[in-house]
């Protein structure tokens, strides 16, 4: 166990364009090797593509996508009597947001479009329409939790 005590969580500054902490978190997840300017330009270009394709406000599409990707339940491995059980647990709101952002970015990177801003825009549009790989990942996580419902009494 660490001896230096508890590290407090840093507060994220709101994004200057959309005035949203969620957008800043998405930029942080997109960022590679500390290149924040590159990550933010990818995100803003993706938001422009969303506005052109859907005609809707990009923040509305993004928030809807987030709500469709956030998991409610997940499974955690717990060792009981020499065997490991996948125990379904509820996901805390902060972790829901983190997982949703992580899945959106990772499945955007796996898409086949030409540039990253196109990939991200299309993944966000798909997620807002309840399709796409990130939503499928959430469904898989929920299916695992449902399949292991019998072990719910081993809660943490």
Curated annotation (Swiss-Prot):
Disulfide bonds: none annotated. One of its GO terms (biological process) is translation. The keyword Cytoplasm does not apply. GO terms for cellular component: small ribosomal subunit. Keywords: Ribonucleoprotein, Ribosomal protein, RNA-binding, rRNA-binding, tRNA-binding. Signal peptide: none annotated. Pfam families: Ribosomal_S7 (PF00177). CDD domains: uS7_Bacteria. GO terms for molecular function: rRNA binding; structural constituent of ribosome; tRNA binding. It comes from the Bacteria. InterPro entries: Ribosomal_uS7 (IPR000235), Ribosomal_uS7_bac/org-type (IPR005717), Ribosomal_uS7_CS (IPR020606), Ribosomal_uS7_dom (IPR023798), Ribosomal_uS7_dom_sf (IPR036823). One of the primary rRNA binding proteins, it binds directly to 16S rRNA where it nucleates assembly of the head domain of the 30S subunit. Is located at the subunit interface close to the decoding center, probably blocks exit of the E-site tRNA. PANTHER family: RIBOSOMAL PROTEIN S7. Belongs to the universal ribosomal protein uS7 family. Part of the 30S ribosomal subunit. Contacts proteins S9 and S11. This is Small ribosomal subunit protein uS7. The lineage of its organism: Bacteria, Bacillati, Bacillota, Bacilli, Lactobacillales.
